[in-house]
């Protein structure tokens, strides 16, 4: 299957980034922001070839003159016209393939509304004429990528986080918990606490700068109170960051205060449980006989689990909640930013998977609802 001519395409549509490539590859070929930008002002320069919309990196680089919109909010597609633009861009500009020649594996958020899966299926077959397609749950793919079939995945991206217990390859829907707290919220919170320090970030374009600060400088403290004291008494934790205009800003306790919101959502004014408690609650909703396997196989996945120190902190917090003799293992693969995509690449290239595709013929016979029968 690693021959590009017939290779399946794997597209992981996240709230923040699209990861796309060919099944059998070990990393996605195209990773670009899930954004569609439209000009804020009427173009005055005739013949400049100004477009009415820009997608991905191009939208990002022209962000100063555009209004940026994310068609995927909290992991779920909310704007199908823009989503179609993103898929079109993925096939024709990024991967440079004809979608009618390749089977395509798409990913979806856990607990995705049924109508959404049907709409995805319909667009693939009717707009892009795909020969075959499949929709897989993101967290399940992350678990495959870690070489397991049983475990609990904490998947946290830009728009949403989920804890998904999986047993022998099947997600347990009654125990899946969703947390509307993820990378974008942490970026917004970092914008807010940097404003308190006297730096002003307000526009959608400036938010991207703060996201970069977050990705480069933030980390999770093992002991938050202790770290706050260290930060107050010395400048050892301070780092500087150069803004695009050359101004240099200094960032101190904000480095760990922003990601701390994952463990203490009250920082964001949210009443929900932190990620450690959410994981624990999710495990407790499972059958008592499989909990041991879940504790011992807690897999982190997604870009918002990339903070240094997050695995150790998670280990510490879950150990405090779990029964005293329980063996707890947090698995944080270095490539976890792309583990959903990697899992999709593995799945779509398995010989045993080939019978699982929904073919164009099956779609024509049954319509969009076929997706519920074949993808679970």
UniProtKB/Swiss-Prot annotation:
GO terms for cellular component: cytoplasm; cytoskeleton. Keywords: Acetylation, ATP-binding, Cytoplasm, Cytoskeleton, Hydrolase, Nucleotide-binding. Its main location: cytoplasm. Its EC number is 3.6.4.-. The modification N-acetylaspartate is found at residue 3. It holds the Pfam family Actin. It is an enzyme of class 3 (hydrolase). It is found in: Cytoplasm; Cytoplasm, Cytoskeleton. One of its GO terms (molecular function) is hydrolase activity. Gene3D superfamilies: 3.30.420.40, Actin, Chain A, domain 4 (3.90.640.10). Residues 1-2 form a propeptide. It comes from the Eukaryota. It catalyses: ATP + H2O = ADP + phosphate + H(+). Actins are highly conserved proteins that are involved in various types of cell motility and are ubiquitously expressed in all eukaryotic cells. Belongs to the actin family. This is Actin, cytoskeletal 2B. It comes from Strongylocentrotus purpuratus.
């Amino acid at each position: 299957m690693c021959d590009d001519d017939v290779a399946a395409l794997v597209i992981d549509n996240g709230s923040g980034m699209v990861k796309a490539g060919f099944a059998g590859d070990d990393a996605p070929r195209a990773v670009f922001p899930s954004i569609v930008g439209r000009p804020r002002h009427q173009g005055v320069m005739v013949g400049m070839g100004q477009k009415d919309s820009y997608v991905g990196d191009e939208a990002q680089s022209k962000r100063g003159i555009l209004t940026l919109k994310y068609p995927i909010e909290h992991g779920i597609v909310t704007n199908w016209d823009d989503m179609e633009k993103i898929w079109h861009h993925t096939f024709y500009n990024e991967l440079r393939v004809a979608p009618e020649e390749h089977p395509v594996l798409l990913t979806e958020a856990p607990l995705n509304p049924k109508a959404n899966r049907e709409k995805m299926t319909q667009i693939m077959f009717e707009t892009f004429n795909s020969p075959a397609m499949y929709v897989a749950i993101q967290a399940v793919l992350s678990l495959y990528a870690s070489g397991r079939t049983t475990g609990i995945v904490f998947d946290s991206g830009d728009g949403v986080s989920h804890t998904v217990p999986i047993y022998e390859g099947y997600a347990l829907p009654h125990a899946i918990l969703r947390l509307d707290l993820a990378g974008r919220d942490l970026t917004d919170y970092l914008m807010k606490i940097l404003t308190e320090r006297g730096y002003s970030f307000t526009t959608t374009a400036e938010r991207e700068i703060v996201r970069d600060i977050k990705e480069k400088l933030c980390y999770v403290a093992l002991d938050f109170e202790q770290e706050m004291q260290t930060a107050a008494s010395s400048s050892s934790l301070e780092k500087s960051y150069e803004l695009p205009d050359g101004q240099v800003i200094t960032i101190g306790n904000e480095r760990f205060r922003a990601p701390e919101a994952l463990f203490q959502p009250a920082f964001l004014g949210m009443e929900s449980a932190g990620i450690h408690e959410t994981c624990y609650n999710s495990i407790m909703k499972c059958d008592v006989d499989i909990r041991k396997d879940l504790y011992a196989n807690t897999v982190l996945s997604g870009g918002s689990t990339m903070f240094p120190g997050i695995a150790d902190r998670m280990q510490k917090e879950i150990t405090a909640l779990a029964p005293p003799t329980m063996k707890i293992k947090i698995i944080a693969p270095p490539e976890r930013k792309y583990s959903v995509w990697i899992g999709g690449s593995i799945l779509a290239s398995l010989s045993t998977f080939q019978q699982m595709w929904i073919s164009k013929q099956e779609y024509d016979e049954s319509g969009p609802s076929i997706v519920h029968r074949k993808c679970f």
